[in-house]
């Protein structure tokens, strides 16, 4: 097989809302969908726990997470890269 296999792992982009736990960040992923019956655009959000080995991501950072093997009871995602650093206020 000379063709590279396409990765079946999902990747999502979201905002870090909590970095209080060791090696773990909580990521809020928002998506906008159209309601089937009424046609209104609705914002839906989900929170994911992602593994941050070095503890380098802080609250407010926009990051990309990738699906992985289960790391703990609630952690099935790994942080892959920083998209945007948090603004300092």
From Swiss-Prot:
This protein's record includes keyword Oxidoreductase: no
Is Ribonucleoprotein there in the keyword field?
yes
Enumerate the Pfam families for this protein.
Ribosomal_S17 (PF00366)
The terms under GO molecular function for this entry are:
rRNA binding; structural constituent of ribosome
Keywords of this protein's UniProt record, alphabetized? Answer: Ribonucleoprotein, Ribosomal protein, RNA-binding, rRNA-binding
Of the GO CC terms on this record, one is: cytosolic small ribosomal subunit
UniProt cross-references to SUPFAM superfamilies, sorted A to Z: Nucleic acid-binding proteins (SSF50249)
| CDD domains, A to Z | Ribosomal_uS17
**InterPro entries linked:** NA-bd_OB-fold, Ribosomal_uS17, Ribosomal_uS17_bact/chlr, Ribosomal_uS17_CS
**Biological process, per Gene Ontology:** translation
Q: What's the family?
A: Belongs to the universal ribosomal protein uS17 family.
The UniProt function text for this chain reads: One of the primary rRNA binding proteins, it binds specifically to the 5'-end of 16S ribosomal RNA.
Q: Subunit comment for this entry?
A: Part of the 30S ribosomal subunit.
This protein is called Small ribosomal subunit protein uS17
The organism encoding this protein is Polaromonas naphthalenivorans (strain CJ2)
The lineage is: Bacteria, Pseudomonadati, Pseudomonadota, Betaproteobacteria, Burkholderiales
- Gene name, Swiss-Prot/TrEMBL: rpsQ
